[in-house]
Every structure is written in C-alpha cells, then in structure tokens.
C-alpha cells in the first residue's frame, strides 16, 4: 500500500505461448488472503473484532477472517528497524506463528526500509545509508536470512516471500533505482538467494503497484530479464481509488479490465505466474469491492490479498480502504467464500 503514485510512460509488447500456471479462484490452492500487519498494534490499542450480522460475537481477527470470510492466507510486512517496533522481526514472528497455528498460509513482505516502502517512498534503512554496494548487498541477504530463520525456528514456513514492496521505481533508492538496473538486479538477487537458502520451495515475488499500468511492469521485468534477475512470481497491487485520485476515468471496472489485460500480457511475455498482493476499495463500497474481487478471481492469478481489511475508517492518519465497518467484516470478502 502507498500514499503517492508517480506516472511515467513506456510500453513494450511481446506475445508468446504461456503455460497453465494458475489455480482456479474457487479451488483450495487459490490464495484468498489478507495482509493484517497492523493487527498487533491495533490489539495493543484495545481494538476488538466481531462476527458479522446481528448476533455479534467477539473473535480474534485472523480466526474471524478464516471462519467468516473464507481467508486461507496471511501476508505480513517486515521493516528493518522501525522506531516503534511494529513490523520488526519479533513482531512478524509473533503474527506468523498465530497464522500458522490457525492453519493459514503465509506471505512475507520485505520492505527493506525502517518504514513504509511504496512507489513514493523507497527509503534506505538508516543503518544502511552509508554502506557500499557490496556491503548493502550483504545487508539485504543477512536481513532476509535472519528474518526467515526466526520464522523457521518457530515452525513457520512461508509459501511466498516478496523481495521489496511496490518497487515500481526500484528499491532502497537511489542505489537500487530502475535507473541503475545492474545495481537493482544485484540487490534483488541478494534477497532471492537469501530466501532460497532458508526456504528453497518458497516462491519469490517482485511486487509493483498499479496493476493496470503495463508500462511499469514491462520496465521492471525487462530490467530483471536483461540483467540476470531472479524471481518466481509477479506481484501487483489493484486500487481503483488510487487510479481515480490520479485522474484515471472509467471506475473500478476499467481498472479491473486493464489489470486483467496486463496479467495476460505478463504471463505470455515472462512465463511467470501472477499474484494480486494487494487489493482494496473504500470501506463503504463493500458490494462493489466484492464484485471487483470476484472479477479478479476469474483472472489468471494465483491468489488475491486484501490489504489491512480489519482497519477501521480513518485508521493510521486516514486509511479508508479497509473492509470492516463497526469492527466487523462487510460483504467485500464474501467473494472469498468457496462455493
């Protein structure tokens, strides 16, 4: 998730045969996910969660999402040295162990920052700012290895690991900018190799924002392909709200159609599966959000993760794209319920 978007324009088209790489949206293998990284912070503030309907029952959030919303996977972000401790390694391990105990699958999302990393913010961790490229590459690998070993030690085996979050302009700027393709690829590969050293079967994801912006995906994945970049899966974010804020017209259906066209293009060009790592709409548009998720579940994707669904309207200085109202789920995630 992010607060700003940047717009550039590049377009490349290549079409080739593509293998079958997806699970059906209603099949058990399809990831019906939620990023709940705020959950421990919210609990520390005394927030509670309730089952939908008139007979409200208090329930732990991950169990609520599993039992009442059809969620089978959890996504958790990792920050390097956050000032308040949330999203550090210990916090991530705590949440991941809870998910594991509920039988939920796990995605780990490395931001490689002390705070939010997104298209408008790809800030180097403070402790890494004066490192050489060689030292930075080592730091990336060590951070990934330390985090994943901590998870392994408590019995958590992530199914997917993101090397960077919404890295449309690159990561750990300016060193890992898309304007420095060799350096960006080297940092990416350091993360990839570290993941595989701990969890060889984990799928490594490179994740960009704006799933309807084909040019950005062509730029990033051409960089990786041309420089020996390693990745197993393409990740995208889908937020019609942000598209509208940028002046794009056509509403959520246009965004969804453009995302689906891009998904088909990416699978054909790069022969990689695609995951919707983030999706969301305003909390008071639950029915429209349900339609968006349902439409995207019919696309050639491996799964869909709603970003912080449990967040109340206005949480954390104004986030309004959750899908809970009065601390209970809206109908948005009904799309995840298996038929």
For the regions a language model picked out, list residue spans one by one.
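Bacterial N-terminal signal peptides
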Residues: 7-17
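Boundary at the C-terminal end of the N-terminal hydrophobic targeting segment
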Residues: 20-25
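Acidic (Asp/Glu)-rich catalytic clusters
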Residues: 26-28, 59-70, 94-105, 149-156, ...
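N-terminal substrate-binding region of glycoside hydrolase catalytic domains
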Residues: 26-105, 111-140, 146, 162, ...
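Hydrophobic faces of well-ordered beta-strands that scaffold small-molecule active sites
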Residues: 30-36, 72-76, 106-110, 159-163, ...
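Active-site beta-loop-alpha junctions enriched in small/polar residues
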Residues: 36-39, 79-81, 111-115, 163-168, ...
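Aromatic-rich peripheral "rim/lid" segments of glycoside hydrolase catalytic domains that contact
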Residues: 44-50, 254, 265-268, 283-339
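Active-site cleft segment of glycoside hydrolase catalytic domains centered on the general acid/base Glu
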Residues: 88-93, 118-231, 243-261, 285-292, ...
């Amino acid at each position: 998730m992010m607060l700003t978007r940047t717009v550039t324009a590049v377009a490349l088209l290549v079409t080739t045969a593509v293998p079958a790489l997806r699970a059906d949206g209603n099949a058990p293998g399809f990831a019906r996910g939620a990023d709940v990284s705020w959950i421990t912070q919210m609990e520390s503030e005394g927030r509670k969660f309730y089952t939908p309907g008139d007979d409200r029952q208090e329930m732990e959030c991950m169990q609520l999402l599993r039992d009442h919303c059809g969620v089978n996977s959890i996504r958790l972000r990792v920050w390097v040295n956050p000032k308040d401790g949330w999203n550090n390694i210990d916090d991530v391990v705590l949440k991941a162990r809870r998910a594991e105990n509920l039988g939920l699958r796990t995605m780990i999302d490395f931001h490689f920052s002390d705070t939010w990393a997104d298209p408008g913010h790809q800030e180097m961790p403070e402790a890494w700012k004066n490192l050489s490229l060689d030292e930075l590459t080592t730091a990336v690998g060590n951070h990934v290895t330390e985090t994943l070993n901590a998870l392994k030690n408590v019995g958590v085996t992530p199914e997917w690991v993101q090397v960077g979050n919404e890295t449309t302009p690159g990561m750990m700027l300016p060193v890992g900018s898309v304007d420095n393709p060799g350096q960006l690829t080297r940092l990416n590969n350091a993360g990839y190799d570290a993941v595989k050293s701990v969890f060889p079967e984990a799928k490594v994801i490179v994740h960009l924002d704006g799933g309807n912006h084909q040019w950005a995906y062509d730029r990033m994945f051409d960089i990786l392909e041309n420089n020996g970049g390693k990745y197993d899966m393409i990740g995208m974010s889908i937020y019609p709200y942000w598209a509208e804020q940028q002046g794009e017209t056509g509403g959520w259906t246009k965004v969804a159609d453009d995302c689906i066209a891009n998904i088909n293009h990416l699978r054909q060009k790069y022969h990689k599966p695609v995951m919707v790592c983030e999706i969301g709409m305003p909390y008071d548009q639950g029915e429209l959000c349900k339609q968006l998720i349902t439409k995207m579940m019919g696309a050639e994707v491996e799964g869909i993760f709603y970003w912080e669904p449990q967040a109340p309207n206005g949480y954390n200085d104004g986030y309004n794209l959750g899908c809970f109202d009065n601390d209970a789920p809206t109908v948005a995630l009904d799309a995840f319920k298996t038929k």
